[in-house]
């Protein structure tokens, strides 16, 4: 859970103000500005206000939070900031707002006048639903829901991707190699830009003096170029530091390239890399990576919840990933980055009181208050009939009819394993699933049998994070068997992206004939067997 109190600037707020925060961002050259959103969707800013980056309509700094009336109720979804700084955000409705430093037209309004208050960015974006924004030092990018990318602002190294080095005063669609391709993620270094496609390909453009584009050379690129060295993997997340880049694949593999003055690549030395290198090879599967164009710090979180950091950490050069005691990558930047900015828009949850949901969670498997027990594999799980009836249609029918189970104090379960059934009952109390990927297939089977559609989605999410070349086809088969369409499509795409390796696994050849034929036919339709 993110604790905004780890950022020094938030010590200016009262406990009541801290308790109201649901989203937040710390930015600025000295981490001296902050924006936060409260639980009733009011937006506040405070801090130094350099270059009017607070958007308050004046150039006055403030230690007391000021409300940005124009953004209240807008439901901020994505936020980024530059070095000026300028601030860029998009709302859940896909609308983009910008303010602050504008010396290079990075606000996208066609001028170089500083923006003293949030103003909607309209040119070429008015009819687009923007789902993500990203900022370099003085350039901006926006990703639309249809996969198109727009860029504007400072373009001295080609970071706008227009094919020239002329500054771009308004949003311009990035084309060339990205034409008719669908981008699903964007990131900016100081003067470089990166994009991830829906098929896992990675493209980069802009400044490449440190090899941060991963192209095997250090020549600047005025238009997007594919990172060919990653052709054998499928990337699903990319982040940029000041002059380095990290990429995370769908198999949980982490790659790094670019500047390495502070060890931010995690390779064990300080040599720059012009091409991607696989790091954290001996660690467990990585599920999240973090970096920020303002800093030379890198962080990663593994499937087991372990958080690692490396690079510039409080003045030290950490050249290998170092295991921390943090629970999230955000804490690394709060405590060790220079400046101590946030690498993304923070989402905050609070535990300052016991909610109804938390009370229910506390009573799961509590013999003191339970009125029913399940016995699975000789082990007992204590539950409450009322909770089961409220949360599950299957149990509502069981306890409101003439089923024999309605009169029992102990119910035997033999069709599911203890870990699976316990995870299911715990889900009814907590609305979350705590189960390793290898057991999630059994829970997916249970969710299908009990018609628990939301639980099916949670199982699919867990399974997706645990997919590997070895189990991909088995998971595809399970998805088909349990009518999990989203998981089926995900597993199918994974198999296609790793077709050679998947077809050499035992799971592939152990599949029954009809399913194998169906897979081959579908793969053929999407061009998997083209020369």
Curated annotation (Swiss-Prot):
GO annotations of cellular component type: cytoplasm; nucleus
Organism of origin: Homo sapiens (Human)
RCC1 repeat windows: 40-91, 93-145, 147-198, 199-250, 252-302, 304-356
Domain of life: Eukaryota
Expressed in which tissues: Ubiquitously expressed. In the retina, present in the nerve fiber layer and to a lesser extent in the inner and outer plexiform layers (at protein level).
Pfam families: BTB, WD40_RLD
Its biological purpose: May be involved in cell cycle regulation by chromatin remodeling.
Annotated disorder: Retinal dystrophy with or without extraocular anomalies: An autosomal recessive disease characterized by progressive retinal dystrophy, chorioretinal macular atrophy, reduced cone and rod responses on ERG, and decrease visual acuity. Extraocular anomalies are variably present in some patients and include pulmonary fibrosis, sensorineural hearing loss, and endocrine features such as goiter and primary ovarian insufficiency.
Localization in the cell: Nucleus
Record keywords: Cell cycle, Chromatin regulator, Disease variant, Nucleus, Repeat, Transcription, Transcription regulation
Name this protein carries in UniProt: RCC1 and BTB domain-containing protein 1
Residue stretches making up the BTB domain: 370-437, 470-499
Gene Ontology biological process terms in this record: chromatin organization
């Amino acid at each position: 859970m993110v604790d905004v109190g780890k950022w020094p600037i938030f010590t200016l707020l009262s406990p009541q103000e801290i308790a109201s925060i649901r989203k937040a961002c710390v930015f600025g050259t000295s981490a001296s500005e902050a924006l936060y959103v409260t639980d009733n969707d009011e937006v506040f800013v405070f801090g130094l206000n350099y270059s009017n980056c607070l958007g308050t309509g004046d150039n006055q700094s403030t230690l007391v939070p000021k409300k940005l009336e124009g953004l209240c109720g807008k439901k901020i979804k994505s936020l980024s900031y530059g070095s000026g700084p300028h601030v860029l955000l998009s709302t859940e409705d896909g609308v983009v707002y910008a303010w602050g430093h504008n010396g290079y037209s990075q606000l996208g309004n066609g001028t170089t006048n500083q923006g003293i208050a949030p103003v909607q960015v309209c040119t070429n974006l008015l009819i687009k639903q923007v789902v993500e924004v990203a900022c370099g030092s003085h350039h901006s990018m926006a990703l639309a829901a249809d996969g198109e990318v727009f860029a504007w602002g400072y373009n001295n190294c080609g970071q706008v991707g227009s094919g020239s080095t002329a500054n771009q005063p308004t949003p311009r669609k990035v084309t060339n190699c990205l034409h008719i391709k669908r981008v699903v993620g964007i990131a900016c270094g100081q003067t470089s830009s990166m994009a991830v496609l829906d098929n896992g390909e990675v493209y980069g453009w802009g400044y490449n003096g440190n090899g941060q584009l991963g192209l095997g050379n250090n020549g600047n690129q005025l238009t997007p170029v594919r990172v060919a060295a990653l052709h054998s993997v499928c990337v699903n997340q990319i982040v940029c530091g000041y002059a380095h880049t990290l990429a995370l694949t769908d198999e949980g593999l982490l790659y790094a390239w670019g500047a390495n003055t502070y060890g931010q690549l995690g390779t064990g030395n300080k040599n720059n890399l012009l091409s991607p290198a696989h790091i954290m090879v001996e660690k467990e599967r990585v599920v999240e990576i973090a970096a920020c164009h303002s800093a030379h710090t890198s962080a990663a979180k593994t499937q087991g919840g372990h958080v690692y950091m490396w690079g510039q950490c409080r003045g030290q050069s950490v050249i290998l990933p170092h295991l921390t005691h943090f629970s999230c990558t955000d804490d690394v930047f709060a405590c060790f980055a220079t400046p101590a900015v946030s690498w993304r828009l923070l989402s905050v949850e609070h535990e300052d009181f016991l909610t109804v949901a938390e009370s229910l969670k506390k009573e799961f498997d509590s013999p003191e208050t339970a009125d029913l027990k399940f016995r699975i594999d000789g082990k007992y799980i204590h539950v409450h009939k009322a909770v089961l009836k409220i949360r599950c249609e299957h149990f509502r029918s069981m306890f409101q009819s003439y089923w024999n189970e309605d009169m029992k104090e102990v119910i035997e379960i033999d069709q599911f394993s203890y870990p699976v059934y316990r995870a299911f009952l715990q889900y009814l109390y907590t609305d979350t699933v705590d189960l390793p990927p290898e057991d999630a297939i059994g829970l997916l089977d249970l969710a299908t049998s009990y018609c628990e559609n939301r639980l099916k989605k949670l199982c699919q999410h867990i399974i997706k994070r645990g997919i590997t070349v070895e189990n991909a086809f088995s998971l595809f088969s399970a998805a088909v068997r349990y009518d999990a369409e989203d998981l089926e499509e995900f597993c199918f795409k994974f198999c296609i992206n790793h077709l050679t390796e998947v077809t050499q696994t035992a799971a592939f050849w152990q599949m029954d004939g009809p399913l194998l034929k169906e897979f081959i036919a579908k793969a053929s339709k999407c061009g998997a067997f083209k020369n």
